[in-house]
């Protein structure tokens, strides 16, 4: 199958599975989305959604977050990984929003990525989901799917993002980002995945990437002493020698 045909078929399947894919992080506006995405680093969206109601009840604006002591922010997000660092970043980025952007989340990659704790992926999510700007956020999960389906041979998320942007139309990037997140969780997980029943891997994943079993370099060669069905004589020989040695020792 030509790659263009594969891309079109994948897009059709994702549209059928998730015609209205929702942002998995609970938020109300660009600022709360930015906060939620910062908190999601090395953490599941489910856990983030468990702590943000309490945090946002106390600070849902840059002004309120900047006033809240770092220790209080950390207490609200204590169950998340990297909580001390994330708390400091939330306080610092809120202060920068007030000082440099009039208390508003900026609508540019350069300004977003200059904020504490905000990398390219976080900025991409905010740009496309909060402002509708062209962006294709790629995390390790989307990177895995792209490799599994033979859409990218990128060595990292940046290279995979580049490849996916070339394959899919710009107008679909934001939708595809969400569809891929949901599809990976529900149909194409990293572990315990059966490619035979996956709506995409079942036909679109190269055998070496689908997780299907296949021959390996460790397979025995025909005629070798380790061929299937032929037991290695070494363990039996060692056992016999040990038995003879014990017999001689008892006879002494």
Predicted regions and their residues:
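Polybasic, lysine-enriched low-complexity intrinsically disordered terminal tails
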Residues: 1, 205-252
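Catalytic cores of DNA base-excision repair glycosylases
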Residues: 2-218
